[in-house]
Amino acid sequence: MEVFFMRRYSATQINAELFWKFPKFLSINKKYVGLTNDDRMAYMLIKDRYRYSLSNNWIDKDKNVYVYFTIDDLKELLHVGKNKVTRIKQHLIDYGLLEIVKQGFDPQNKKNYPDRIYLLQPEYDPTDLISQSSHASALEQSGIPKMGTRYQNEGNLDNKGKSDSENCNKDTSALEQSGIPKMGANKDNNSSDTIKDTIKDTDQWNFSTNNYTPEQVTAQNQDLLSHLGETLTGDKEAPMFLNKDSINLIAKWFRTPEGASECISTILNAANDSRKNAESQIGHHELYFEDYNNELKRMITNRLRRYFNKMRTAKDGKIKNPKNYLYVSMRNMFDKWQNDVLMAEKDKANNKD
């Protein structure tokens, strides 16, 4: 029998984990009692993707937000098979919680586009809303910290998501701003001194921009961006692809460290995907990007300048997804460069023979 090592949580680890937000109506609203737990979990996972929708501007002409969520994505996250995922999606459609709009082939752009997935708002029971209102009033009179409403919490939590570069400090900050009361130690709740101390200690480690003046936030961002190259020195991957000119370019065009970090991650993802694609087609080969440091870094700098020039000169609305445009641009460059080097080495080997 396998023995598991069990550890208790320390006070500093409580907020260090990432969480999905589970909509309460999925469990308490009688209209949706027929949903399975997998159905509810799928709704929650799709709702979480709205964070990426907002950052990528996945908003249709009617200003409705949509997501992209493949069957493989749901299979992996729910740990179920393809048929089960199909049934789950159909259940959500039958209950009026999901709508799928097929995109298909766009003859103008000559591309196949994935289906758009829209989550639909649930039908609330009016009596539930009244009871929630009464409950909130009762809490105010009881001295118990009042929970934010579902809509208030959504507005704060849904904006915390970033790219894969999320870290626990950001998520902790977002949770602290979500309207959820901060839980103190198991002490006398009537002690005003205890409450003041708890708030004071928490605020000292809350780095949300909400805790600073706009001038302070601007100064902080400028400092981090001006030293962007130094912050990357501990990253074993980033210096391999980016020279000083590229780092300075990124720092000039992005106003926040989050934006600069996401730009760098996009370039790295394009490079890694290009390498993986080549290996899947021709098998393992001895070509590594780091072997061609200077050449590749100069190419990235030139491609970045072309990208920013395109962003500046393109007509408003023509490029709907700048992040995706950068990824495709870099991916095409990596693919072509890698193919050219491999072909040159192949020709060199043939000439020796």
Curated annotation (Swiss-Prot):
It comes from the Bacteria. This is 41 kDa protein. InterPro entries: Bac_RepA_C, RepA_N. Keywords: Plasmid. Residues 157-169 have a biased composition (Basic and acidic residues). Residues 132-197 are annotated as: Disordered. The keyword GTP-binding does not apply. Signal peptide: none annotated. Transmembrane segments: none annotated.
